[in-house]
Design a protein with these regions (language model features):
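Macrodomain-like recognition of ADP-ribose-binding/processing modules
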Residues: 1-180
Length: 180
Protein backbone atom coordinates (compact mmCIF):
# COMPACT_ATOMS: atom_id res chain seq x y z
CA UNK A 1 0.00 0.00 0.00
CA UNK A 2 1.40 3.35 -1.03
CA UNK A 3 0.27 4.94 2.23
CA UNK A 4 2.56 2.61 4.21
CA UNK A 5 5.72 3.39 2.25
CA UNK A 6 5.39 7.12 1.58
CA UNK A 7 4.12 10.39 3.00
CA UNK A 8 0.80 10.05 1.10
CA UNK A 9 -1.28 9.29 4.20
CA UNK A 10 -0.11 12.49 5.89
CA UNK A 11 -1.03 14.52 2.81
CA UNK A 12 -4.50 12.98 2.59
CA UNK A 13 -5.27 13.05 6.32
CA UNK A 14 -5.51 16.81 6.87
CA UNK A 15 -8.33 19.00 8.21
CA UNK A 16 -8.82 20.48 4.72
CA UNK A 17 -9.15 17.04 3.13
CA UNK A 18 -11.59 15.93 5.81
CA UNK A 19 -13.67 19.06 5.32
CA UNK A 20 -13.73 18.99 1.53
CA UNK A 21 -13.63 15.27 0.79
CA UNK A 22 -14.00 12.63 3.50
CA UNK A 23 -16.70 14.12 5.74
CA UNK A 24 -19.14 14.89 2.88
CA UNK A 25 -18.56 11.44 1.40
CA UNK A 26 -19.14 9.66 4.69
CA UNK A 27 -22.30 11.70 5.27
CA UNK A 28 -23.68 10.41 1.96
CA UNK A 29 -23.67 6.77 3.20
CA UNK A 30 -23.26 5.64 -0.41
CA UNK A 31 -21.00 2.61 -0.97
CA UNK A 32 -20.84 3.38 -4.70
CA UNK A 33 -19.01 6.59 -3.72
CA UNK A 34 -18.65 9.25 -6.41
CA UNK A 35 -16.28 10.29 -9.16
CA UNK A 36 -14.23 12.79 -7.14
CA UNK A 37 -10.47 12.53 -7.37
CA UNK A 38 -7.61 13.95 -5.34
CA UNK A 39 -4.38 14.87 -7.13
CA UNK A 40 -1.43 14.85 -4.73
CA UNK A 41 1.92 15.88 -6.24
CA UNK A 42 5.42 15.26 -4.92
CA UNK A 43 4.80 12.23 -2.72
CA UNK A 44 8.05 10.86 -1.32
CA UNK A 45 8.39 7.07 -1.33
CA UNK A 46 10.90 6.14 1.37
CA UNK A 47 10.08 2.53 2.29
CA UNK A 48 10.13 -0.72 0.36
CA UNK A 49 6.90 -2.12 -1.08
CA UNK A 50 7.11 -5.43 0.76
CA UNK A 51 5.00 -7.27 3.33
CA UNK A 52 7.06 -5.55 6.00
CA UNK A 53 8.10 -2.19 4.54
CA UNK A 54 11.63 -1.18 5.44
CA UNK A 55 13.22 2.23 5.26
CA UNK A 56 15.22 2.59 2.05
CA UNK A 57 18.59 4.28 1.79
CA UNK A 58 18.02 8.01 1.31
CA UNK A 59 19.56 7.89 -2.19
CA UNK A 60 16.88 5.36 -3.19
CA UNK A 61 13.92 7.53 -2.22
CA UNK A 62 11.86 8.80 -5.13
CA UNK A 63 9.00 11.18 -5.81
CA UNK A 64 5.68 10.39 -7.48
CA UNK A 65 2.38 12.15 -8.01
CA UNK A 66 -0.68 10.24 -6.81
CA UNK A 67 -4.28 10.39 -7.99
CA UNK A 68 -6.78 9.04 -5.48
CA UNK A 69 -10.29 7.92 -6.42
CA UNK A 70 -12.63 5.58 -4.55
CA UNK A 71 -13.83 2.38 -6.17
CA UNK A 72 -17.40 1.19 -5.56
CA UNK A 73 -17.66 -0.75 -2.30
CA UNK A 74 -19.61 -3.90 -3.16
CA UNK A 75 -19.03 -5.75 0.09
CA UNK A 76 -21.98 -7.54 1.66
CA UNK A 77 -21.58 -5.24 4.66
CA UNK A 78 -19.96 -2.13 3.19
CA UNK A 79 -19.44 -0.27 6.47
CA UNK A 80 -16.51 -1.13 8.71
CA UNK A 81 -13.97 0.81 10.76
CA UNK A 82 -12.21 1.94 7.57
CA UNK A 83 -15.36 2.77 5.61
CA UNK A 84 -17.73 3.96 8.30
CA UNK A 85 -19.68 6.19 5.93
CA UNK A 86 -20.54 3.48 3.42
CA UNK A 87 -23.83 2.53 5.03
CA UNK A 88 -24.99 -0.86 6.20
CA UNK A 89 -26.82 -2.11 3.10
CA UNK A 90 -25.08 -3.79 0.23
CA UNK A 91 -25.61 -2.42 -3.25
CA UNK A 92 -25.93 -4.61 -6.32
CA UNK A 93 -25.54 -2.58 -9.50
CA UNK A 94 -25.45 -4.52 -12.75
CA UNK A 95 -22.12 -5.30 -14.38
CA UNK A 96 -22.99 -2.80 -17.12
CA UNK A 97 -23.68 -0.06 -14.55
CA UNK A 98 -20.40 -0.86 -12.81
CA UNK A 99 -18.49 -0.80 -16.08
CA UNK A 100 -19.84 2.68 -16.81
CA UNK A 101 -18.83 3.86 -13.31
CA UNK A 102 -15.33 2.40 -13.67
CA UNK A 103 -14.86 3.88 -17.14
CA UNK A 104 -15.92 7.34 -15.97
CA UNK A 105 -13.60 7.27 -12.95
CA UNK A 106 -10.69 5.93 -14.93
CA UNK A 107 -11.15 8.69 -17.51
CA UNK A 108 -11.07 11.28 -14.70
CA UNK A 109 -7.87 9.74 -13.35
CA UNK A 110 -6.18 9.67 -16.76
CA UNK A 111 -7.39 13.17 -17.67
CA UNK A 112 -5.83 14.43 -14.45
CA UNK A 113 -2.59 12.65 -15.30
CA UNK A 114 -2.58 14.27 -18.76
CA UNK A 115 -3.29 17.73 -17.36
CA UNK A 116 -0.44 17.31 -14.88
CA UNK A 117 2.01 16.13 -17.57
CA UNK A 118 2.56 12.60 -16.27
CA UNK A 119 4.65 10.42 -18.57
CA UNK A 120 4.04 7.15 -16.73
CA UNK A 121 0.80 6.01 -15.12
CA UNK A 122 0.50 3.01 -12.82
CA UNK A 123 -3.06 1.82 -12.31
CA UNK A 124 -4.37 -0.77 -9.90
CA UNK A 125 -7.14 -3.34 -9.95
CA UNK A 126 -9.50 -0.61 -8.65
CA UNK A 127 -11.70 -2.32 -6.10
CA UNK A 128 -11.07 -5.96 -7.01
CA UNK A 129 -9.75 -6.76 -3.55
CA UNK A 130 -11.45 -5.59 -0.37
CA UNK A 131 -14.31 -3.88 -2.24
CA UNK A 132 -15.29 -7.07 -4.13
CA UNK A 133 -15.51 -5.64 -7.66
CA UNK A 134 -15.43 -8.27 -10.41
CA UNK A 135 -12.02 -8.33 -12.13
CA UNK A 136 -13.62 -8.96 -15.54
CA UNK A 137 -15.74 -5.80 -15.24
CA UNK A 138 -12.87 -3.62 -14.04
CA UNK A 139 -10.36 -4.99 -16.56
CA UNK A 140 -12.83 -4.54 -19.43
CA UNK A 141 -13.51 -0.96 -18.36
CA UNK A 142 -9.76 -0.34 -18.15
CA UNK A 143 -9.18 -1.78 -21.62
CA UNK A 144 -11.95 0.36 -23.10
CA UNK A 145 -10.56 3.55 -21.57
CA UNK A 146 -6.83 2.93 -21.94
CA UNK A 147 -7.25 2.54 -25.71
CA UNK A 148 -8.09 6.26 -25.84
CA UNK A 149 -4.96 7.21 -23.89
CA UNK A 150 -2.38 4.89 -25.44
CA UNK A 151 -0.39 7.78 -26.90
CA UNK A 152 -0.86 10.25 -24.05
CA UNK A 153 1.82 8.59 -21.88
CA UNK A 154 5.17 6.86 -22.35
CA UNK A 155 3.95 4.01 -20.15
CA UNK A 156 0.67 2.76 -18.76
CA UNK A 157 1.22 -0.08 -16.31
CA UNK A 158 -1.16 -2.13 -14.22
CA UNK A 159 -0.10 -3.18 -10.73
CA UNK A 160 -2.55 -5.93 -9.83
CA UNK A 161 -2.10 -7.32 -6.34
CA UNK A 162 -2.70 -11.03 -5.78
CA UNK A 163 -2.34 -13.23 -2.75
CA UNK A 164 0.26 -15.96 -3.29
CA UNK A 165 -2.52 -18.55 -3.17
CA UNK A 166 -4.82 -16.80 -5.67
CA UNK A 167 -3.63 -15.09 -8.85
CA UNK A 168 -7.09 -14.88 -10.44
CA UNK A 169 -7.14 -11.05 -10.51
CA UNK A 170 -3.83 -11.03 -12.37
CA UNK A 171 -4.96 -13.72 -14.82
CA UNK A 172 -8.14 -11.80 -15.69
CA UNK A 173 -6.34 -8.47 -16.15
CA UNK A 174 -3.59 -10.13 -18.17
CA UNK A 175 -6.12 -11.84 -20.44
CA UNK A 176 -8.22 -8.71 -21.02
CA UNK A 177 -5.34 -6.24 -21.38
CA UNK A 178 -2.89 -8.39 -23.35
CA UNK A 179 -4.40 -7.28 -26.66
CA UNK A 180 -3.62 -3.59 -26.05
Amino acid sequence: CLCRCSNLYFCLNTPDMWGMFYTPHRAAHDPIHNDDIIYTPDIVVFKTDTDRPELMERDDWYIVDVITCAAPNLRENPSNRYNSGDGTRAVTPSNRELQVIHEKRLRRILDSAVINHADTVILGAFGCGAFCNEPQVVATAAANVVRDYMYAFKNIEFAVYCRPSDDSNYRVFNSVLSSL
